[in-house]
């Protein structure tokens, strides 16, 4: 029997502080719960949306019930007895970090049980010898930033000076990351990508998970904005991924939409499609669901929940984007084929109501839909790897080293 898997990952969509949140300074974080609370109390009203958070299709897959199991609290405005069509669980992260790469790798069978390298100093964040080597190897004459920063704020603060000098802007965050912002037209995309490649080679021995190209456009601080030509340079996964097993054992197609290919350093990816906005990500995902052949795994990362709303602590924007996604989810459900397995999940939290601008250590929702799957609670997962192990079971692949299968199909041999 030919099968397909569709994974929709809502980047940063946590459902409540996990039991180890205190170790990360994240007690009280709850991305979904705090957005729902703000909406219910009319604190997230805008020209685009008003009132309680309305996510009927996500609720039908078990989102609210998953959050209830994780936190003992139903998100405000959610149904206690929705018309349930999906099977649901919630998962804690086994990996040592709360970043994008750790979450994604873990769910495909490669939890990060080592410590990434970090730049912990808020100012003068990068070692001088590293900066000197980057300058020597790339021939840049100087740099700006060298600090922890919000990506949107630092281009406002330093973008005009960058245009005067063409010095790239270097910055980091609480994640294992080295980010480089330049003007896409004045500095040039090819020059930015070449700079990032050199920086990645220099930083890889320090276990810095990613170097990220962050191009922007505009003439002054009032109109600087980032473009869709972001590119991530990631360390290769340290363990074999589910993707590779699928290709080896079933000659499967692994279709990346959005930044998935970059996150996995292009390991085990057979096709990739870029998209610049939440609408485009939904459009391309729907197109692939309609057209991808059997024996395919379609994997989309919906990055804007994290980059545009979580990190920017924009509760109303996050809520509006969720409601837009939920409306598009109806289209996705309507276009699934007979034997498709749909999975909705996240990679970490990024509570827009929480202090700071960083990710938050939270449980994630794990929601499944398949015509032969009984709507039910599937339990608490001790690792995101249960997602990959469940996919391996569904596709008839060799088991992963981590995780347990959550699925039990009606009439499956």
From Swiss-Prot:
Ligand binding (Mn(2+) 2): 306, 311, 359
Subcellular location(s) per record: Cytoplasm
Pathway where this protein functions: Carbohydrate degradation; 2-deoxy-D-ribose 1-phosphate degradation; D-glyceraldehyde 3-phosphate and acetaldehyde from 2-deoxy-alpha-D-ribose 1-phosphate: step 1/2
EC number: 5.4.2.7
Annotated binding of Mn(2+) 1, by residue: 11, 347-348
GO molecular function, a single term: manganese ion binding
InterPro entries from the UniProt entry: Alkaline_phosphatase_core_sf, DeoB, Metalloenzyme, Phosphopentomutase_DeoB_cap_sf
BP terms from Gene Ontology: 2-deoxyribose 1-phosphate catabolic process; 5-phosphoribose 1-diphosphate biosynthetic process; metabolic compound salvage; nucleotide metabolic process
Record protein name field: Phosphopentomutase
């Amino acid at each position: 029997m030919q099968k397909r898997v569709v994974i929709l990952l809502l980047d940063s969509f946590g459902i409540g502080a996990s039991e180890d949140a205190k170790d990360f300074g994240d007690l009280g974080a709850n991305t979904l719960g705090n957005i729902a609370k703000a909406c219910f109390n009319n604190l997230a009203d805008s020209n685009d949306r008003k009132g309680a958070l309305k996510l009927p299709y996500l609720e039908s897959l078990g989102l609210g019930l998953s959050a209830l199991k994780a936190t003992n609290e139903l998100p405000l405005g959610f149904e206690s007895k929705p018309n349930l069509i999906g099977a649901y669980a919630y998962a804690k992260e086994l990996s040592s970090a709360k970043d994008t790469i750790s979450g994604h790798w873990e769910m495909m069978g490669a939890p990060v049980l080592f410590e990434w390298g970090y730049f912990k100093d808020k100012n003068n964040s990068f070692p001088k010898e590293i900066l000197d080597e980057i300058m020597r190897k790339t021939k840049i004459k100087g740099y700006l930033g060298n600090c922890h920063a919000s990506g949107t704020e630092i281009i406002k603060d330093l973008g005009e000076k960058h245009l005067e000098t063409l010095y790239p802007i270097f910055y980091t965050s609480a994640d294992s990351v080295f980010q480089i912002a330049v003007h896409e037209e004045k500095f040039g995309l090819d020059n930015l990508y070449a700079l990032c490649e050199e920086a990645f080679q220099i930083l890889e021995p320090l276990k810095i998970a990613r170097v990220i190209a962050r191009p922007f456009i505009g003439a002054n601080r009032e109109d600087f904005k980032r473009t869709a030509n972001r590119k991530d340079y990631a360390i290769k996964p340290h363990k074999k991924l589910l993707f590779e097993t699928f290709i080896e054992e079933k000659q499967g197609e692994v279709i990346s939409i959005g930044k998935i290919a970059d996150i996995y350093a292009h390991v085990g990816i057979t096709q990739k499609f870029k998209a610049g906005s939440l609408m485009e990500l939904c459009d391309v995902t729907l197109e692939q669901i309609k057209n991808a052949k059997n024996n395919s795994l379609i994997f989309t990362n919906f990055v804007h929940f994290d980059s545009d709303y979580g990190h920017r602590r924009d509760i109303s924007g996050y809520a509006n984007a969720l409601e837009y996604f939920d409306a598009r989810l109806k289209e996705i459900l309507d276009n699934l084929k007979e034997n498709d397995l749909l999975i909705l999940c996240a990679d970490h939290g990024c509570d827009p109501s929480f202090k700071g601008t960083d990710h938050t250590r939270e449980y994630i929702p794990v929601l499944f839909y398949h015509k032969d799957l009984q709507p039910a609670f599937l339990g608490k997962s001790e690792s995101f790897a249960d997602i990959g192990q469940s996919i391996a079971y569904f596709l008839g692949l060799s088991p992963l080293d981590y995780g347990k299968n959550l699925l039990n199909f009606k009439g499956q041999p």
